From Swiss-Prot:
Record-annotated EamA domain positions: 40-109
Source organism, top-level taxon: Bacteria
Subunit structure: Heterodimer of ArnE and ArnF.
GO molecular function, one term: carbohydrate derivative transmembrane transporter activity
Species of provenance: Escherichia coli O127:H6 (strain E2348/69 / EPEC)
BP GO annotations: lipid A biosynthetic process; lipopolysaccharide biosynthetic process
NCBIfam families from the UniProt entry: PRK15051.1
Record protein name field: Probable 4-amino-4-deoxy-L-arabinose-phosphoundecaprenol flippase subunit ArnE
Topology in the lipid bilayer: Multi-pass membrane protein
Function field: Translocates 4-amino-4-deoxy-L-arabinose-phosphoundecaprenol (alpha-L-Ara4N-phosphoundecaprenol) from the cytoplasmic to the periplasmic side of the inner membrane.
Pathway connected to this protein: Bacterial outer membrane biogenesis; lipopolysaccharide biosynthesis
UniProt topological domain (Periplasmic) ranges: 57-60, 109-111
Transmembrane feature ranges: 36-56, 61-81, 88-108
Coiled-coil zones: none
């Protein structure tokens, strides 16, 4: 159950980052303020809930084991940026993502 909590904390943290990015995207002049407030409000809600879940994780898992798992955030954000905003990602970046996944597998397999 605690590992599921860690996954949700990671996904909520990613959602918060994506909401911040969306807040910076274009909105018409008459809707700009509402657009920014909406997306930044959602970002704060996601990041706040992620923090609460993270604290629950830290009560049950050594930080040296739990923290590296948050590296998945880099993977999720990269995938979302490509899908949502069609951001270009270099081969070097994809190699880095692969190394991150490999590192998580290595660190997670010691549990």
């Amino acid at each position: 159950m605690i590992w599921l909590t860690l996954v949700f904390a990671s996904l909520l943290s990613v959602a918060g980052q994506l909401c911040q990015k969306q807040a910076t995207c274009f909105a018409t002049v008459n809707k700009r303020r509402k657009h920014i407030v909406l997306w930044l409000g959602l970002a704060l809600a996601c990041l706040g809930l992620a923090m609460v879940l993270w604290l629950l994780v830290l009560q049950n898992v050594p930080v040296g084991i739990a923290y590296p798992m948050l590296s998945l955030n880099f993977v999720w954000v990269t995938l979302a940026a490509v899908k949502l905003w069609h951001e270009p990602v270099s081969l070097r970046h994809w190699c880095g993502v692969a190394f991150i996944i490999g590192g998580i597998v290595i660190l997670g397999s010691t549990v």
